[in-house]
Amino acid sequence: MESKQKRTALVTGGSSGIGRCTVAALSKAGYIVYEFSRRDVPVEGVKHMCVDVTDEASVQEAVGQILLERGSIEILVNCAGFGISGAVEFTELKQAKAQFDVNFFGTVNVSRAVLPSMRRQHRGHIVNISSVAAVDRKSTRLNSSH
């Protein structure tokens, strides 16, 4: 069993991209790292949990399990997300809703699950990672009307 002295980090979307790099960096820095993703792509030295961030009950259950095992979560890094390319008029509404569910409401679900324990322990950090496409004024999604 790992020492309770080591701090605990939780990373969403940790199976690829920035999330996977974040998982590796936190693990290297000495954190006990838990990783949420829908894909079953375990990373060595990391506790992978197959969790869909859009499923509030699943998120609550998984965070509860981490808190039972570790007692606290000091760092939450929300990296889960995906992008849709192309002009908005060609984007299916179902795709846009799925993107909001993961990118926004997924972040809300996990943050809401972790925040009460951070408040009780009077410490903790939440980092939300987003794509530059969210603020890029040249995005086709913003200038697609004629």
Where in the sequence are the language-model features?
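The beta1-alpha1 cofactor-binding region of Rossmann-like NAD(H)/NADP(H)-dependent oxidoreductases
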Residues: V51-E61, L93
